[in-house]
């Protein structure tokens, strides 16, 4: 998948140089950001195609522009493949992002001032699930549920109590920093009990669901949204799925003309390619390996004295509590990047530090698994992370010698598992 990459010459030297530098960074660093992945050369080629020239407001067979015969074909393929992947009756592939997909759902189902309930951002939720700095937090009356302070798991009985008490019109299930399985069936039972819509944002888990290694949200949710990158290994974009024909009409109208104008046909083509890749039998093997690798990484970090939120992972994601080492997420992120390991600082439940400092880091196994890393490589990555963190525990500025040694070992791993070979 990653063994061929055709270089289209960019004559703008400033941009060409930046692209070349970014390509080198991706080749020589180990990507551990849980929301990132490495797409195939085919996905890149589709996204860089002449489809970027075409305006196509509307939907296949019902456009506001002429000349849409071939982009209709592309979008319909994307829709059909997406429905097949998740067992959905209806799908919209036009949202430009996961945030746009969520916003379209709110536009379709809610009125300003309606009450929504989602996982608190401080406990692993996402900005678009009701954070006060976002449209969802400004336009709607938001109540939040949290994870258990001891287990760091979603307590479904507490969610039920909160829903019965507050009677939201829409409940959001999904997260940006929750490594465990989510009880989508349980959420639907609660939504039905209080007369609410259930929207599942499966952005982080979509590829694992497509591969059959994480519970499928689509049979339980009124509406399911997702990004198409992350574990699904497609271009950056969003999608919406439902099994309800009446909701599908409202959702389509909310995407266009309600929330967006012309669709990005080159991105939709890349989505179609990625969905086709995810339908292949080997993608299930990939998804299973992603989880096995994340679990191996978590085990090594626990053995090395770090805390792991919820004690482990059922997904691609490992949320690390750095407090046992007396290190903040901010300095850990910087030091690990110096050593060739890219991750992000991340708040942990009930984090005493500010969001720009944090007590944790979030790690992901998706991109490394795409490179070809297995359990042994992720165990080694865990040991490398510990060396950098232990050096920070001794000296907050880090140990340049340790970081240089780790950087050499990272380079060797990357060389053994190359990406985008010309």
From Swiss-Prot:
Listed pathway(s): One-carbon metabolism; tetrahydrofolate interconversion; Amino-acid biosynthesis; glycine biosynthesis; glycine from L-serine: step 1/1
Function: Catalyzes the reversible interconversion of serine and glycine with tetrahydrofolate (THF) serving as the one-carbon carrier. This reaction serves as the major source of one-carbon groups required for the biosynthesis of purines, thymidylate, methionine, and other important biomolecules. Also exhibits THF-independent aldolase activity toward beta-hydroxyamino acids, producing glycine and aldehydes, via a retro-aldol mechanism.
Entry cofactors: pyridoxal 5'-phosphate
Binding, (6S)-5,6,7,8-tetrahydrofolate: 121, 125-127
InterPro entries: PyrdxlP-dep_Trfase, PyrdxlP-dep_Trfase_major, PyrdxlP-dep_Trfase_small, Ser_HO-MeTrfase, Ser_HO-MeTrfase-like, Ser_HO-MeTrfase_PLP_BS, SHMT-like_dom
GO molecular function, one term: pyridoxal phosphate binding
Summary of subunit composition and partner proteins: Homodimer.
EC numbers, comma separated: 2.1.2.1
Pfam families: SHMT
GO biological process, one term: glycine biosynthetic process from serine
Residues under site feature: Plays an important role in substrate specificity: 229
Catalytic reaction list: (6R)-5,10-methylene-5,6,7,8-tetrahydrofolate + glycine + H2O = (6S)-5,6,7,8-tetrahydrofolate + L-serine
Name of the protein in its database record: Serine hydroxymethyltransferase 2
